[in-house]
A protein has these predicted regions:
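Short, charged beta-turn/beta-strand-edge "cap" motif at the junction between a beta-strand
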Residues: 36-41
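Compact nucleic-acid interaction/catalytic patches
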Residues: 43-87
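Loop/turn positions that initiate beta-strands
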Residues: 27-28
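Residue-level recognition of conserved beta-strand positions in structured domain cores
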Residues: 35, 69-70, 97
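C-terminal terminal-subdomain/extension
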Residues: 1-10, 15, 23, 48, ...
Length: 130
């Protein structure tokens, strides 16, 4: 499968140039994020905007946060944590794909995750990293 690196690079330059755009965000939010086209098995964004929903795990500053991407291709293993219905589809987070992003990549908020489910995800991330 050919990836659209050149098309994404143009989009990424535009996103990077948005010096006045810094959305306010909070942990537990699920938002659309311009993840782009990535290497190998790293989770890509989809569609014209190269986007997919992400869960904000930790805010580090106004400019950067730690996220995990969502997927509708749910697998039954310790790296996929089910979330239920998100934006009209059954979804899960992929904790093995945890990453730091610039908040310029974030846009439309979808929902705020339930505190109990978020606590389960935090625990799974801690276990992954320990």
């Amino acid at each position: 499968m050919d990836k659209e690196f050149d098309k994404w690079n143009k989009k990424k330059k535009h996103i990077n140039g948005q010096s006045d755009y810094l959305p306010l965000y909070h942990e537990r939010q699920i938002r659309w994020c311009r993840l782009g086209v990535n290497v190998g098995f790293e989770q890509d964004g989809t569609g014209e905007g190269f986007s997919r929903p992400v869960l904000i795990i930790k805010g580090l500053s106004r400019n950067v946060c730690i996220v995990v991407p969502l997927t509708t291709a749910i697998k039954n293993n310790k790296y996929f944590i089910p979330l239920g219905i998100v934006d009209g589809k059954e979804a899960a987070v992929i904790i093995s794909q945890i990453r730091l992003i610039d908040t310029k990549r974030l846009y439309k908020q979808i929902k705020t995750l339930d505190k109990n489910i978020f606590a389960d995800i935090q625990k799974a991330v801690r276990n992954l990293l320990s």
